[in-house]
C-alpha cells in the first residue's frame, strides 16, 4: 500500500545517522508525536543540503511543537555520515540536529510513493504524520525545487490546532488568525468578519 492522506503511515525501521553515529530509527519510536518525514534524492547534490540544513536549524521549533523531523535518502548510512563530516562551505552538511535515514533497499521510498524506480532515487516528498500514525499531509516536489520549512511548521501547527479545537482553518491561516466553526450556521461568523 502506498502512503495516503487519512491512512496509517507505512511503518519503517532504518539505520540512520543521528548525532554523528549510526542508530536504528523507526516510526514507532515517535508514536505520540507529530513526524515530518522528508525525502531527498541524493547526498552530495545541490538542493538537498539547503533543505537538510534549513530543517536542522529549525529542529528546535518543531520540537517545541511536539514534532520530530526525519530526512530519508536512498544513499547508504556511510555516505550520509561522510556528508555530515564535510563543512557547509564545501557543500556538506556539517553537524545536524535531525536524523538522516538510509533507505538503501528503497523500501521506504517505495512505500511512500516517492521512488523513481529507474533512477533509484526519491522525489522530494514531505509527509506529516500525526501522533496516532495517520498521514495528514503529503507534498511531492520534482527534483529541482526545495521545500519551505516555515510552511511545514505552519502545517504541523494547523493540524494540531484542528485536532485540539475542532475548528477548520481558512486559506493562509497562521497561528492566532481567525478560524471557522464547521457548521453552516456557525461558519457565517467567520465569513461575515472576513468579507466586510
Curated annotation (Swiss-Prot):
Residues binding substrate, per UniProt: 45-47, 124
Database matches in InterPro entries: AhpC/TSA, Peroxiredoxin, Peroxiredoxin_AhpC-typ, Peroxiredoxin_C, Thioredoxin-like_sf, Thioredoxin_domain
GO CC, any one term: cytoplasm
Reaction it catalyzes: a hydroperoxide + [thioredoxin]-dithiol = an alcohol + [thioredoxin]-disulfide + H2O
PTM info: The enzyme can be inactivated by further oxidation of the cysteine sulfenic acid (C(P)-SOH) to sulphinic acid (C(P)-SO2H) instead of its condensation to a disulfide bond. It can be reactivated by forming a transient disulfide bond with sulfiredoxin SRX1, which reduces the cysteine sulfinic acid in an ATP- and Mg-dependent manner.
EC number(s) given by UniProt: 1.11.1.24
Phosphothreonine carried by residues: 174
Record note on what altering residue 171 to S does: Exists mainly as monomer. Has no peroxiredoxin activity
GO MF entry, a single one: identical protein binding
BP-aspect Gene Ontology terms: cell redox homeostasis; cellular response to dithiothreitol; cellular response to heat; cellular response to hydroperoxide; cellular response to oxidative stress; chaperone-mediated protein folding; DNA damage checkpoint signaling; DNA protection
Top-level taxon: Eukaryota
Active-site feature positions: 48 (cysteine sulfenic acid (-soh) intermediate)
Segments forming domain Thioredoxin: 3-161
First-listed, main subcellular location of the protein, grouped into a coarse class: cytoplasm
Keywords: Antioxidant, Cytoplasm, Disulfide bond, Isopeptide bond, Oxidoreductase, Peroxidase, Phosphoprotein, Redox-active center, Ubl conjugation
Subcellular location per the Swiss-Prot or TrEMBL entry: Cytoplasm
Site (Important for catalytic activity, helps activating the peroxidatic cysteine through H-bonding): 45
Glycyl lysine isopeptide (Lys-Gly) (interchain with G-Cter in ubiquitin) crosslink site(s): 14, 89, 132
Leftover remarks: The active site is a conserved redox-active cysteine residue, the peroxidatic cysteine (C(P)), which makes the nucleophilic attack on the peroxide substrate. The peroxide oxidizes the C(P)-SH to cysteine sulfenic acid (C(P)-SOH), which then reacts with another cysteine residue, the resolving cysteine (C(R)), to form a disulfide bridge. The disulfide is subsequently reduced by an appropriate electron donor to complete the catalytic cycle. In this typical 2-Cys peroxiredoxin, C(R) is provided by the other dimeric subunit to form an intersubunit disulfide. Present with 378000 molecules/cell in log phase SD medium.
Family: Belongs to the peroxiredoxin family. AhpC/Prx1 subfamily.
Known function: Thiol-specific peroxidase that catalyzes the reduction of hydrogen peroxide and organic hydroperoxides to water and alcohols, respectively. Plays a role in cell protection against oxidative stress by detoxifying peroxides and as sensor of hydrogen peroxide-mediated signaling events. Protects the cell against the oxidative stress caused by nascent-protein misfolding and aggregation. Relays hydrogen peroxide as a signal to the transcription factor YAP1 by inducing the formation of intramolecular disulfide bonds in YAP1, which causes its nuclear accumulation and activation.
Quaternary data: Homodimer; disulfide-linked, upon oxidation. Interacts with YAP1 via transient disulfide linkages.
Name under which the protein is recorded: Peroxiredoxin TSA1
Source species taxonomy: Eukaryota, Fungi, Dikarya, Ascomycota, Saccharomycotina
Gene: TSA1
Amino acid at each position: 500500500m502506498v502512503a495516503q492522506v487519512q491512512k496509517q503511515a507505512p511503518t519503517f525501521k532504518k539505520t540512520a545517522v543521528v548525532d554523528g553515529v549510526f542508530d536504528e530509527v523507526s516510526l514507532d519510536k515517535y508514536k505520540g508525536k507529530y513526524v515530518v518525514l522528508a525525502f531527498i534524492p541524493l547526498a552530495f547534490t545541490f538542493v538537498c543540503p539547503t533543505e537538510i540544513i534549513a530543517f536542522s536549524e529549525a529542529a528546535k521549533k518543531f520540537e517545541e511543537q511536539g514534532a520530530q523531523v526525519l530526512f530519508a535518502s536512498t544513499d547508504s548510512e556511510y555516505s550520509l555520515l561522510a556528508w555530515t563530516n564535510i563543512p557547509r562551505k564545501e557543500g556538506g552538511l556539517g553537524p545536524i540536529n535531525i536524523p538522516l535515514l538510509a533507505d538503501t533497499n528503497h523500501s521506504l521510498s517505495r512505500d511512500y510513493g516517492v521512488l523513481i524506480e529507474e533512477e533509484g532515487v526519491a522525489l522530494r516528498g514531505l509527509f506529516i504524520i500525526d501522533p496516532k500514525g495517520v498521514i495528514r499531509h503529503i507534498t511531492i516536489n520534482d527534483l529541482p525545487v526545495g521545500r519551505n520549512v516555515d510552511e511545514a511548521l505552519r502545517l504541523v501547527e494547523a493540524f494540531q490546532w484542528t485536532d485540539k479545537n475542532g475548528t477548520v482553518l481558512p486559506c493562509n491561516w497562521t497561528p492566532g488568525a481567525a478560524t471557522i466553526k464547521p457548521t453552516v450556521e456557525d461558519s457565517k461568523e467567520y465569513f461575515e468578519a472576513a468579507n466586510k
